[in-house]
């Protein structure tokens, strides 16, 4: 009996035309049947947003051997939900988000539409991976990341991931990658996030900007340290965000009324 090819579902938050997504497709060709359901335009920072106030549509934009590409009017999470409900012929072997234009290390994982894709796949019990490059430009060079993407994806297809666990993989913007580091998420936060401007017709408006404040720049087990030193940062990420260590302490609080 002929073995089925792996079924790979891709999406992103930069849109179906983004270079990162198309480089991801190129890097994964030959590994299985690839189905893409991506937003019809940029949806960066969408996180886990879903569309509930109006209908969502999708359209086929490309089809060739072992590759079918659709664009969707919804969010990145909508794309995964809709693809699983409509266009995939069976349960995917892996869900992949990316390659994102810009890193999703540290707290960025909470804002990221790319990781929204990954978390949605993980919630559905499917092994899921997010790939991101530390370069926001539309013409970013993803070539050095592609061999690692292929290897990591092969390993996930071979071993699988435990229920509730997904991978957040970030690449430094360099042609000379030093290798892979298994990392934890860096502790930090965005500061000075808003640029205020005055409108010529009166009033004010704001652009989201900001800078990242790394609370632990010397932490060699963190993703930011790895990226800053030329390593691919692989961070296992979990769906269950319960702070188990706090549960017993809370039981001692007087919370009843």
From Swiss-Prot:
Q: Which InterPro entries match?
A: SurE, SurE-like_Pase/nucleotidase, SurE-like_sf
What are the EC numbers? 3.1.3.5
Query: GO CC annotations?
Result: cytoplasm
Catalytic activity field = a ribonucleoside 5'-phosphate + H2O = a ribonucleoside + phosphate
Record text on cofactor binding: Binds 1 divalent metal cation per subunit.
Cofactor dependence: a divalent metal cation
Residues recorded as binding a divalent metal cation, renumbered to this chain, are: 13-14, 44, 100
| This protein's UniProt keywords | Cytoplasm, Hydrolase, Metal-binding, Nucleotide-binding
Q: What class of enzyme is it?
A: hydrolase
The job of this chain, per UniProt, is described as: Nucleotidase that shows phosphatase activity on nucleoside 5'-monophosphates.
**The protein's name in its UniProt record:** 5'-nucleotidase SurE
């Amino acid at each position: 009996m002929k073995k089925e090819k792996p079924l790979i579902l891709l999406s992103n938050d930069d849109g179906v035309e983004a270079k990162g997504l198309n480089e991801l497709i190129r890097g994964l060709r030959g590994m299985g049947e690839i189905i893409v359901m991506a937003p019809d335009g940029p949806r960066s920072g969408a996180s886990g947003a879903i569309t509930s106030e109006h209908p969502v549509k999708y359209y086929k934009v490309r089809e060739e051997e072992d590759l079918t590409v659709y664009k969707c009017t919804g969010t990145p999470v909508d794309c995964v939900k809709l693809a699983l409900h409509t266009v995939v012929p069976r349960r995917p072997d892996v869900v992949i988000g990316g390659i994102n234009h810009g890193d999703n290390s540290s707290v960025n994982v909470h804002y990221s539409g790319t990781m929204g894709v990954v978390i949605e796949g993980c919630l559905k019990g499917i092994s899921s991976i997010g790939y991101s490059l530390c370069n926001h430009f539309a013409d970013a060079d993803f070539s050095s990341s592609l061999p690692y993407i292929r290897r990591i994806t092969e390993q996930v297809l071979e071993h699988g991931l435990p229920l509730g666990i997904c991978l957040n993989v970030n690449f430094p913007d360099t042609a000379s990658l030093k290798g892979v580091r298994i990392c934890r998420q860096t502790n930090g936060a965005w500061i000075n996030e808003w640029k205020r401007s005055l409108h010529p017709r009166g009033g004010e408006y704001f652009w989201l900007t900001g800078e990242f404040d790394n609370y632990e720049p010397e932490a060699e087990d963190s993703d930011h340290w790895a990226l800053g030193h030329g390593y691919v940062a692989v961070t296992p990420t979990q769906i269950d965000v319960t702070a188990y260590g706090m549960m017993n302490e809370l039981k001692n609080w007087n919370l009843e009324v």
